[in-house]
Design a protein with these regions (language model features):
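Transmembrane beta-barrel strands of outer-membrane/channel proteins
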Residues: 28-36, 77-83, 126-132, 168, ...
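Gram-negative (and chloroplast) outer-membrane scaffold detector with strong preference
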Residues: 65-147, 239-246
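Predominantly the C-terminal beta-signal and adjacent terminal strand-loop region
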Residues: 173-246
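Short coil turns and loop connectors of transmembrane beta-barrels in diderm outer membranes
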Residues: 22-26, 71-73, 117-122, 172-176
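Extracellular loop and loop/strand-boundary signature of outer-membrane beta-barrel proteins
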Residues: 46-53, 91-100, 147-154, 224-228
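Bacterial N-terminal signal peptides
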Residues: 7-15
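Short glycine/proline- and aromatic-enriched beta-strand/turn motifs that initiate or cap beta-hairpins
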Residues: 21-71, 230-246
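Short sequence motifs at beta-strands and strand-loop junctions characteristic
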Residues: 54-59, 99-106, 154-161, 230-234
Length: 246
């Protein structure tokens, strides 16, 4: 599913809402929060250099969110931008430094179920979504053995994933709500890929793409082909979003 399809879905939702009766509500908002790497997306910079994890630490996340309230459930869509980074030693000996940074652009949509609480100023919700992720980044090596010093781009790749979320909607006024939520996002559950963009087989080439699949040329003791297993990447987002009814 490409982002254009999801954006088209959001446009259709807006058209439906503009012609719907009073039982349908529409809200649009923007928010920010933190993004925590989970699974193989976390770890230390030494893990990244060794090819076992990506070694990222907690970063930030921004989003634009649309919520359409329908009888019995809610349909939610959004666009997110997240950034994660880390820096530290490349090896346990302390030789060399690594700085790794990755950015994630996400387009997502899915259903949401609200749990009304009579006379309460807040409404809990549970939801799920299908998401398209575009992932890119940079890696900087300084004084590291087996790779040249410098900054190398991590080529842009896309992955289809899904997320599960929960939160509460706090009513601030007749047309304004505060949405406090958390989402666990699975970024690459369906597709993993090993991609070498250079014809050479030097170690540094392995860091020039996401390369979340096992290196097909992996061999014990081979310092150029060192990624021994596929890596599953996920993240936890905790967000505060101001929603305005239209």
């Amino acid at each position: 599913m490409k982002p254009a399809y999801l954006l088209l879905l959001l446009c259709i939702i807006v058209l439906v809402v503009s012609n719907a009766d009073s039982q349908v509500t529409f809200q649009l908002g923007a928010g920010a929060g933190i993004r925590l790497p989970m699974g193989d997306y976390s770890g230390e910079t030494m893990d990244y250099y060794a090819g076992t994890k990506y070694g990222l630490s907690t970063g930030y996340n921004f989003q634009a969110k649309a919520r359409v309230g329908l009888p019995g459930f809610t349909l939610v869509g959004g666009i997110e931008y997240g950034h994660l980074s880390n820096k530290g030693d490349a090896e346990a000996s302390g030789q060399g430094r690594v700085e790794v940074a990755q950015s994630i652009v996400t387009v997502k949509a899915g259903p949401e179920i609200t749990i009304p609480l009579p006379a309460a100023p807040l409404t809990p919700y549970l939801g799920a979504n299908v998401a398209w992720h575009s992932i890119s980044g940079t890696t900087t090596f300084t004084g590291v053995s087996r790779v040249p010093s410098g900054t190398f781009d991590v080529g842009v790749v896309s992955r289809i994933g899904f997320g599960i979320n929960a939160g509460v909607i706090i009513k601030l006024g007749p047309m304004m709500n505060l949405d406090l939520g958390a989402e666990y996002a699975f970024l690459n559950p369906l597709t993993k890929e090993w991609k070498i963009t250079e014809t050479s087989a030097n170690r540094v080439d392995s860091y020039k793409s996401l390369n979340d699949e096992k290196d097909p040329l992996y061999a014990v003791g081979n310092t150029d082909h060192f990624v021994a297993a596929a890596r599953s990447i996920s993240s936890l987002q905790v967000m505060a979003t101001l929603m305005i009814g239209l």
